[in-house]
């Protein structure tokens, strides 16, 4: 697969939320190849997805009309940016004479930690990623730090993360299993990871560990067992923490 630094530069869960009476919104910039050679922008108006743009990446500067609506009252707009490409943004342009303001929000905060599944790689569109869907369902502000290929890694934790979440989900394990990590090793790492997370970023948060659910070769017999057996080791380790579900 792609090096992790390429996927890390493809930010996931980036959403532009604002209220406007403008009937149009144009985006000017470059949509560069990242983890994929295509990208998507999903546009939601007053809670309903009305546009799902799918375009090929290119180093050329282009202007994309994100929406074109009938003239009307102020609407709440949410634009979800690509999770698989790199966006170099030059300008966002509203119709002449229109007004816009950031959408008022005192929502609680959700931190999604994980690998490519959390990142939303190969989802139908950027708003189809489960972290985006969950944030929308719970009406929470999302910070998605999922990166393809990542594992339970203590060095990846940011103890000084300025984003203070109310909810944290951690979804690792499938890449740990594919790398041959033993059940004893993953259990020890999960305990160290959760201990540190609960003492820092997630000190005031509800924390949920999501174990791997499925992968195509999950029934393969590895020294660490099948993926289901490996997942059980993660769940058992996580269950030793009262604050973790």
Label each region the model flagged:
Residues 1-110:
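N-terminal secretory targeting modules
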Residues 9, 22, 155-245:
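Alpha-helical cap/lid subdomain in secreted, periplasmic
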Residues 27, 113-114, 210:
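Short hydrophobic segments within beta-strands
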Residues 31-33, 116, 174, 213:
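Residue-level signal for short, function-critical loop segments
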Residues 40, 132, 235:
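Short glycine-/small-residue-rich flexible loop motifs, especially phosphate/cofactor-binding loops
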Residues 57, 117, 149-151, 214, ...:
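Residue-level detector of flexible, active-site-proximal loop/helix-junction positions
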Residues 70, 103, 135, 199-200, ...:
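Generic structural signal for beta-strand residues in well-ordered domains
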Residues 78-148, 153-164:
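Serine-esterase "nucleophile elbow" of acetyl-processing enzymes
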